[in-house]
Amino acid sequence: MLLKSPDKSPEKILKLFDEVYSKARIFYLLRTAIDLNLFEYLSSFKTAKELAEILDADLILMEYMLKILNELDLIESKVVSERIYYKNAEITNIYLKKDSNYSIINPIYSYFENIKNWENLADILKNKSNCSNMDVDNFFPKVVRRMADECKCWELQKVLNYMAKYEEFKNAKKLLDLAGGHGLYAIGFSMLNRNLKCYVFDLPNVIEETKKFIKKYNAKNVFTITGDFYKDDIGKGYDIIFCSYNPGGKNPKIAEKVYNALNEGGLFINKQFFPDKEEGIEDYINNMEWNFSKPEGLKKGKIRYTFEGDLNLNDYLKYLEDLGFKILEVVDMSELLGLDENSSSFRKSANPSDSLRFKDNSPAKMIVAKKL
């Protein structure tokens, strides 16, 4: 046996593990950089020695860490008198510094928390029922804060500016942000149309977070309504109802409530994920992770971002038409978020495939429908 080679070389398997291991090391290096607040110290140029002293870190390891971050385009370098100096790249100052208005450090920490599930995958596989239940009362407020930090740095502005072109929006007097969470969309809409009164409807514990954002942005025309949209009345007389990434966003019963709550000629703007099929390993991994947890009170589907009673995109559009809506357009969110006439480098540095939520050929769509 010692002198006989196997029928196949181990190269493929070794290469697979080598590639995965390399990416895992980068992941933990990035986590360490954020945990150590490394980027907070690199607003101006510093040497590896200076940074090592500040962080009380090993100099050799710090030198390599900075070289790696430089290769990842998160920091830039210059050489002065044979010394290498490093400072944050512009995109790092925007998104990876705590004092930035567009910091996404909080959403990024969800990766660091979620990786623990993969480290304990054997336990989850064998004992899912014992470790998968999640307290919705604590879950949603935490998610709301992260979604606020995430959306305000790109998606929020893109959606607001896109919808501002509609005459129906310009003439609207009353808007409902249904299951609006942080309420940033309602706040933004109220800034674009000063005659618009906006209402954010969500669960009581979530609304407590909403109120903090309303106060932060001094949004005088934004108000809150507490309730469960599956069970409670959502009100009437709205000119616009806006819906974004919520569990009932593809549910026909919620769509009917929306129709009944809108004025004639009113707009229903619904931004949701409509996954229709699994297309390879990335979908398999995401869907597997989706099934790690089961928040109490939410009946999740097998596929990521789906829930019991959901309709697929085509069936949902047909249902809206049967209710009495006219579909004005269906916007591909990856295209909407991927266009920036002011930045030629956008597709390289901040395109949807690099964001926390979107990728090319994203199943996320924004439906704009009008009640006839």
UniProtKB/Swiss-Prot annotation:
What's the Enzyme Commission number for this chain? 2.1.1.-
List positions binding S-adenosyl-L-methionine: 202, 227-229
Q: What class of enzyme is it?
A: transferase
Write out the GO MF terms.
Answer: O-methyltransferase activity; protein dimerization activity; S-adenosylmethionine-dependent methyltransferase activity
Q: Which UniProt keywords apply?
A: Methyltransferase, S-adenosyl-L-methionine, Transferase
Give the GO biological process terms. Answer: biosynthetic process; methylation
Q: Which InterPro entries match?
A: COMT-like, O_MeTrfase_dom, Plant_O-MeTrfase_dimerisation, SAM-dependent_MTases_sf, WH-like_DNA-bd_sf, WH_DNA-bd_sf
Hey, which family's this protein in? Answer: Belongs to the class I-like SAM-binding methyltransferase superfamily. Cation-independent O-methyltransferase family.
Protein name from the UniProt record: Uncharacterized protein MJ0086
Species lineage:
Archaea, Methanobacteriati, Methanobacteriota, Methanomada group, Methanococci
